[in-house]
């Protein structure tokens, strides 16, 4: 299809067609105008993989490590390659736009979507997002930076008013967007759900038009977050929101037609919104993706290798006393813990997807160990009972269960079977499930499979629904979640609290499991303040009841007999998810006790934590070997095993500060919405800026990470260009330092460049990260590393009186740090205070 002549097309469009173009037609597609050859475009989540068009029963995809994991690599070259693969995955899914990267700032360790963003620091987050976006767009696919801006919590996210100073907005929350845009001007940007200082961002001219378009010179398409449009006329259209997502429209359509006819919205303003839609069509047109393209899979060996590399390079070696790691492959090993035999490969919400495959830590370790491998559960990490679908069999012997859709409930004697599927996962979000015979969101589903337990005992069963549900064992109701329902956190905050029941089962006996589900309209639960996604969703699980004491006792016994021990603990997509902020930083119940007991009998045990954001570690002082392994994507288990056994030398550095306790974090008194507002009381002191200013030592600082080798840094040279009368864009500060691998194994070092400001008119952080570079070195090898930063970006703070950046005169110190102790310093001078705006 040829490129559109945008001006001519706008002239030829009828008013109704223009209005159609500025809102989606369904969950993932824009409108088409066939008579003018304007195609429909497809969008897809998301930040750590391209899901395609279906949450429910979708086509599998590559799952990348979560953003904080990628942030821990501090590797722009790797993120560039990740972006390339994301672009190729999008093309395979027939998607023109990837809804990512996410670059909100983790002002609290509790944010439900904290794992979706790269770092607490705008320089690190912005560079990684920029290179990831560049990789995506070099494949012809449009990237989408989100959520613009201050969408930093899930609590009351549609309504909360973020009260934040302009200085903090500029220096902390807008900075990653600004830096990413300097590297790659993404084709699209998504607005945040929240308000800033009284106005929703999706109708906030200051941010969409004045800053993004005028000051930064960006000319792409602005879309709303899903159901994040709150107005029709002057508020969103005039503010610069180009397209409302998803469809069908709530705020445009007939309401917008009336607004144009009454001059509430001038047609030339609508034309500007349409222009940006058509420009996006032209941007992705060379892809040649047909409308309603078939969704395909890639899963190539080279893709698997990249995912494995990313998983391994993201792992942060927090402690390694007595050089306990790497382990010896010839020795026996005990693999213990709640995360050992599950693949905690991604967080929850719009970042979740059905991966091509997953590798658990136990599988990864077992594949590499040449000695005996033993396992003990130790404790469980589930929030709700673990899914049971993969343990069921159909009546014809297939793994999974039958999913039968009816027009009437099970109590009806003459109901019609509308559709039948075979499923394996006992969790389903039906918002994008469609079938020609299903005419509304009201229908009923019977799910049926057979369970044969391996062990006798009391089994607990649990049901979570957006709708209503009953679980039956051999036709006996064990769980009834149809009455007196309580709203919980699952399914973006739409789901009920898990209702439970129990039944004693005998090993080897086959039991029929039936789950009767009614969609969302069958429930009378109060869902004010949350968005209901169509027909709702379901989740049912089960587990044999065991006491924590029994589990730990068995784990201690197994650990005591092995040469080497590794404990896998942490969180999962149940604990870290969109729609829900964590109430605390704690590991799931039982995990801390398990780790402490194992360390008592095996002080040399290695502890591996999987989480997207910080957790408390009361046992950390006793642990000699400790790794942070994040949510590692498809290859999480292999990546962890590669580091444990020394196939890969760990090179990750923390992109987040890990506080000793929740009360230490700077947002502790001001997180969550109170009376519809959240006060960003810590101002610019987010993350390390606060801990260093307050002289409050964290458990592990931002930028920390050890290696199996050692490095030296020396010969710091600092060069600056002669100052002009006017501070020039691109005027550089170039730092050169020699890095040497002084150890016995190859490794990678991240050189971090910090700038310490002189005394200035305003209170400033002790120092701020301004640049970084990663270098790979063989044993004994030296390389000169060069980091170039612009002087104006290295020295400026936001002056609210002048509404401009201020590069204040004075002597600034550069600090260069990396693995281990030692700081190299140098200085440069800014001789004249200057003010500037722009990108």
UniProtKB/Swiss-Prot annotation:
Keyword Glycoprotein: yes
Pfam families on file: Fn3-like, Glyco_hydro_3, Glyco_hydro_3_C, PA14
Biological process annotations from GO: cellulose catabolic process; glucan catabolic process
Record pathway: Glycan metabolism; cellulose degradation
GO molecular function, one term: beta-glucosidase activity
GO cellular component labels: extracellular region
KW Chaperone (keyword) present: no
Keywords, comma-separated and alphabetical: Carbohydrate metabolism, Cellulose degradation, Glycoprotein, Glycosidase, Hydrolase, Polysaccharide degradation, Secreted
Glycan-linked positions: 197, 494
Compartmental location: Secreted
Highest taxon listed in the record's lineage: Eukaryota
SUPFAM superfamilies reported for this sequence: (Trans)glycosidases, Anthrax protective antigen, Beta-D-glucan exohydrolase, C-terminal domain
Family: Belongs to the glycosyl hydrolase 3 family.
PANTHER family: BETA-GLUCOSIDASE, BETA-GLUCOSIDASE-RELATED
Protein known as: Probable beta-glucosidase I
Taxonomy of the source species: Eukaryota, Fungi, Dikarya, Ascomycota, Pezizomycotina
